């Protein structure tokens, strides 16, 4: 009784600490690959499972998924999780190596992808606290992916502004270079028009 409760409290404390740590690491991630690697490492360390991050593009289409080293991803369940925005479980959560849990990465505006989790063959189904941990991780990943999206949007906007300034400068320089000779030619034409023929 008491030892079990003490052990459960210790596990909860370790997982809370791990969540704070992964949140900090995800906040510093600069690429999708870094986010994916952090997710895999966290799921492996905390639950002994394998994870695959399947991001969605800007049109909310899932990008082609690689396979999990431990097993396969069910594309139908992946699509169901993306379409419904809800966690989808295969009938049997106990490990057989194939992905059996699909968590949507819901951000403030839309779903940013799916986290597919595969439990190793022969492992029991995760307890409720393990599922809650995965849902918290999915929320953190969604926030990180949304932040990366907005960084890309800001960089793209900045690039457009710089290219527009460059285009404007080039056109201004060209127009000045063309204006000077044209002004001289117009002046000469006016002079010739004003001169009476002999």
What are these regions (language model features)?
Residues 1, 195-198:
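Short, intrinsically disordered, charge-balanced linker/junction segments flanking boundaries
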Residues 1-25, 144-150, 160-161, 166:
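Signal-transmission linkers at sensory-effector interfaces
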Residues 21-156, 183-193:
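GAF sensory domains
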Residues 129-132, 165-169, 198:
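Long cytosolic heptad-repeat coiled-coil signaling/dimerization helices
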Residues 168, 172-176:
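Conserved phosphoacceptor histidine of two-component systems
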């Amino acid at each position: 009784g008491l030892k079990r409760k003490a052990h459960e409290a210790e596990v909860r404390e370790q997982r809370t600490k791990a969540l704070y740590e992964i949140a900090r690491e995800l906040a510093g991630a600069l690429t999708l690959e870094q986010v994916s690697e952090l997710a895999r490492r966290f799921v492996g360390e905390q639950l002994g499972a394998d994870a695959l991050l399947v991001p969605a593009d800007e049109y909310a289409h899932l990008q082609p998924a690689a396979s999990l080293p431990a097993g396969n991803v069910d594309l139908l369940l992946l699509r169901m999780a993306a379409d419904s925005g809800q966690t989808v479980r295969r009938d049997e959560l106990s490990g057989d190596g194939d992905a059996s849990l699909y968590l949507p990465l819901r951000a403030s505006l839309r779903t940013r992808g799916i986290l597919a989790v595969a439990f190793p063959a022969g492992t029991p189904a995760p307890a409720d606290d393990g599922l809650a941990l995965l849902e918290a991780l999915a929320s953190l990943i969604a926030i990180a992916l949304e932040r990366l999206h907005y960084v890309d949007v800001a960089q793209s906007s900045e690039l457009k502004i710089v290219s527009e300034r460059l285009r404007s400068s080039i056109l201004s320089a060209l127009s000045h270079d063309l204006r000077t000779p044209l002004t001289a030619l117009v002046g000469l034409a006016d002079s010739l028009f004003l001169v009476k023929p002999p």
